[in-house]
Each structure stands twice: as C-alpha cells, then as structure tokens.
Amino acid sequence: MPAPPRIHGKRGVHDSRFLRVEEVDLEFSNGERRTYERLTGSGLGAVIIVPMRDDDTVLLVREYGVGLDRYELGLPKGRLDRDETVEQGANRELKEEVGFGARHLKILTTLSLSPAYMTHMAHVVLAQELYPERLPGDEPEPLEVVPWKLSELHTL
C-alpha cells in the first residue's frame, strides 16, 4: 500500500454551528496534486446505538433527515458531549431518543460513515437490559419508537 498523500495545506472554507468545510491540498505518491473538501467537526465523534428490547427485538426510531428530505427509520444516534465516554453518550442518547436506559453497553466497532469527506468517527454500541428512563433531548419533535424483530430486518 502506498504512503498516504502529502498534505501541502489546509484552509477553512465555511463554518457552521456543528461543522466546518475544509479544503485540503494533497500530493499523491505519483506526483498528482488535488484539492479535496472535507467536513470536520468537534472531533468528539458520535454514537449509533443498537437497543435490544429482547434477544430478537431492536428498537428503531423514525425521524426526519434533512439530507434526504424525508422521514427515515433507523438506529438512535447522536453526537458525543465533552467529558463523556462513549458508553455514557450512548446511554444519554438512548434516554433522549428512545426513553430507555441500558444496564449493559458494549462498543461493537468504530467506523467512518463517509471516509471520503468526513473526519469524525461513529461508535456502534450494543445496548441491552433496557429500563424506562427519559431525558429531554434536542429533537424538534417527538420521535416515533418502532420495535422491529431481527428476523424481519430484511423487510426494512
């Protein structure tokens, strides 16, 4: 595998409340130079929670996604706060979005959702032994919680 491209420069193009668009000037191992844009964030990352109501039922949430301009059914997720472990952030987001906490949390993997243009990482966390507890969240409207059998995931 070749060495990563050499970075000749970085500059901020635009800042928003949550993200920054950054241009990165690169030189590849064959001498080819390109400028790419990427989204950078706080660097804290995010969590994607797999909340298991029982061994065969995952709890999904239906929420509006502005990127797709439609409501989507998916796993609860959110940004990590400062001074918060991955497990603490996952449990907080679970309480805010689903109305449950978890007695058992396990980090399954850490991944990039869009490695071509995003710098932050998402931690996928399995949440088991759920108990009812709701925290106020930052969602603009209540989220619909939808139990889904693992044996029926192919129908999503």
Task: Give each language-model segment a name.
Residues K10-I48, R53-D54:
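Acidic, metal-coordinating catalytic segment for phosphate/diphosphate chemistry
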Residues N30-T35, R70-E72, E133-P136:
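Short small-residue beta-strand/loop micro-motif enriched in glycine and branched aliphatics
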Residues L39, G43-K77:
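A glycine-rich, hydrophobic loop/mini-helix early in the fold
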